[in-house]
Amino acid sequence: VAYRDRLGAERIGIHTDAASHRDILGYGIVVAGVPIGDQEYVRVHLAKTASATKSKIETISSKLRAESVQALHVLNIFCLQPIFTYWTQHVYPSDVVEPNRRYPRAEAPAAVVDSALLEVACATHGAFVRDDPFANARLRLPAKFNGGGLRSLAETAEAAFAAAVIKIAPKLIESTDDQGTKRRGFLDGIPGMAALFGEGSFDGDADFPWGGPGRFAAFITGDDRLPCSVEFTNAWSRCREAAVGDPGAADRDDANALPRSGLLAQPAENAGLIDDAGNGVPTRPLIGGMQHALSEQIEKYRRGVLDRDLRELAPSDFRRIAWLNCNATSRVWLVVLPDRDNELTNPEFAEVAARYFGAPSPACSAARGERFGRGHRGGDPRTVDEYGFTVNSVSSVPGGGWACLHDQIKNEMASSCREMGQEVSVEVHNLFSHLIPQGPGRVAWRDLSSRTRWGLVPDFAMRIRLGGDPVKFYLLELKCIHLSAAWYGQDAGCQREEARGKSCVPVEKRAKAVAAEYVKKAQETDQTYCGTAPGEIGPVEAKLRSFEKSVPLVFGAFGEASDGVEQLIDALAEAGADVHWRGMKAKKREEAKGALVAYLRR
């Protein structure tokens, strides 16, 4: 029973004769952890479950917060968030999401757990993920949509429950497969089950193994519908309303259109079936991953709405800049466990999170307004801003941070190439220098500083298959762009491309300039040290043009990478899968390649 003790606290316990009827709130039982019974019994049980979940989350958070917010963040995403998912799948959404009518002030169970998870996110990322509406919306999206990976239990409860019904219901009553063989139902012996779902509703054929169009019609229609059918119908309808239109509908402001493709294009009687042709007629069932597919369709629409809203912000708004300059490499930090090679200190993690979500830098905010360094060409010292534009755009800051960053990325990439079984040369010094003839030109070349001569020293040279082409010899040049107004400011010239829906424009803009820079340097070297007349092709330029192409590898201030980096990662994963897939105990090469792509990005 659910009862109220002498102190007024609500509890779940065993009914005894000594219990007063005035103290008993409701009766019920627990089946596999799920409360079934009177509304008050279910309410009290779920409230206790949510409270216990919240307590566990707060305990773990308090123990880890001071030690490693990175570890706490990973636990929040992968361990704490799923704790309450079981009840969102198996309890009516109205009991999990909606506040109880009798106690309107009480938070719904899902909201209680969501609040606790959000407090952990505030501890790991910063209070901006709660206070800023755009950061909060990003936090609720999955990482693959440039979100924070912390889904709201209240927002996913309908999809979780509907997916559980779609998965379980066809197995509950007797049906036949496409060969006419009878399949026993899990609840065959319970009277009324066949009438509830409709005899033959889940009979299979060659196209639909567990029932075709209209398979849930008997379940959701009728004057005497049970609460389970009402809850399922409502959950499915709300999922459809949450994904109004296709993902592009957000740009057309088509707020009243229902989805026109995917699972949610179908009404409740066809739940679980997909219309591939887009004409409203189901063509196949979805086999497995039902909740994932439902959530993904809803989240695609929400991402489209968020993308539209963020693009409408002022070009100088840092939240807009951050959103438009994140891609697959930017979000790796969200899923990386701290270890010897990937551990971040608490201040470092706070900086990474703030940059990703477009919030002010904690370090720079603390020093905002202070003056440091020397201005351009001996001018006045620079002023620290809250986002770090000034600090990150100055290459002369003591410590050589720019060079260290470049070299660390270069060495890590070379190590990854070799780990994937590829031979790679790093900083190929002798590729062009031997082409300068003996004489005054060569003497002048030798008198140059090593930094100047390195202008024609490729970062990498290797033979590899890129983009489906045959194996060729490529020069690869690593470039890093930093947080500065020249690249990310409103005068950087990226607005036109961004208005067309493009993202990560600065790194691609920098990548496009690399090949021309190489040719220009080669021409200047020929004309200055080899005696080549302007307009003619000298030995250095001829050697450069003998290679297939120079592949630019550009990394940006938000961890974003250019297309060249993604091509290299794909090529290395392909080569590594050939070498390692058996040692990885993968079933096939493709499975190993997917794991290696994630590994190389990290």
What are these regions (language model features)?
Residues 1-602:
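Nucleic-acid-interacting cores, centered on viral/eukaryotic replication and modification enzymes
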